[in-house]
Regions:
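Cleavable N-terminal export/targeting peptides
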Residues: 1-46, 238-242
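Flexible, solvent-exposed coil segments and beta strand-coil junctions
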Residues: 56-62, 102-110, 160-170, 209-214
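Gram-negative (and chloroplast) outer-membrane scaffold detector with strong preference
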Residues: 41, 45, 49, 83-159, ...
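Extracellular loop and loop/strand-boundary signature of outer-membrane beta-barrel proteins
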Residues: 63-68, 110-115, 169-175, 215-220
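Outer-membrane beta-barrel pore domains and translocons
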Residues: 56-60, 97-99, 144-148, 203-207, ...
Length: 242
């Protein structure tokens, strides 16, 4: 067993950050599912449907190559969700929402400058919902692919044509690829009451696409965002009539 773990560690050191993120998310999901295999049998399972609303804040940066010095940019998110618990400890969750992400540049040597790019996306995550716990409190992990479409962008800056960073092409470049796709996942806790289910969830999104053209000869060879989200959600269960 230890030799397998050492081999896996050596393999992870040799892969790219993007592949490492994918492998990590898939491993966490696999471990969460198998962690429930040994639990004692409970009363007969019944499928569960719930619909909810979500909202919170997110902090985003962008992986640029060449590198752009940044600080996390704060944005907000909100949306709706539909959840279907298909079997014990496992379900599906479909979401539709709005999220604001982008980047805030750092000018350490010339702090009088400011540059913030905000990008607004409509997003559709398709998630596997893994949970365990009691009838009162559940811990869960959501994991799956996500697609999005850019609906608008805005800039807050005072550069006035100055080029204070080593990389400055992005200051005058509009977003070139409006479609986005990637992987997202994260843990959360759910309090189940007679008036509905209340959630607190953290989530990480890693874009597998670039919003600028990254062909040979372009200004950037990489331009993909990553987003950390903290959000609250309220779900109301309902029953489907057959």
């Amino acid at each position: 067993m230890m030799s397998r773990l050492h081999s896996a560690a050596r393999w992870l050191q040799g892969v790219s950050n993007r592949r490492r993120a994918i492998v990590l998310l898939l491993f966490i999901g696999w471990a969460a599912v198998h962690a429930t295999d040994g639990r004692a049998q409970r009363p007969t399972f019944r499928e569960e449907w719930a619909a909810g609303v979500t909202g919170g804040i997110n902090y985003s940066t962008v992986f640029f190559a060449p590198k752009v010095h940044q600080s996390p940019m704060q944005g907000f998110n909100g949306g709706v969700a539909l959840r279907w618990i298909t079997e014990r400890n496992l379900g599906l969750q479909l979401e539709a929402g709005f999220r604001q992400l982008g980047w805030r540049e750092r000018f350490d040597e010339q702090p009088q400058y400011r540059y913030i790019r905000r990008m607004n996306y409509v997003e559709l995550p398709f998630l596997t919902h893994i949970y365990f716990g009691s009838d009162r409190v559940r811990f869960f992990f959501n994991l799956g692919p996500q697609i999005g479409f850019l609906t608008g962008e805005s800039t807050d800056e005072n550069l006035n044509g100055a080029t204070p960073n080593k990389t400055n092409d992005q200051h005058t470049m509009a977003i070139e690829r409006r479609f986005a796709w990637g992987l997202c996942g994260g843990p959360g806790v759910e309090l189940r009451t007679s008036v509905g289910y209340f959630q607190l969830e953290g989530r990480y999104y890693y874009s597998l696409g670039d919003f600028y053209s990254t062909r040979h000869g372009d200004a950037f060879s990489k331009a993909s965002p990553q987003v950390f989200t903290m959000r609250l959600a309220y779900f109301m269960p309902f029953t489907l009539r057959h």
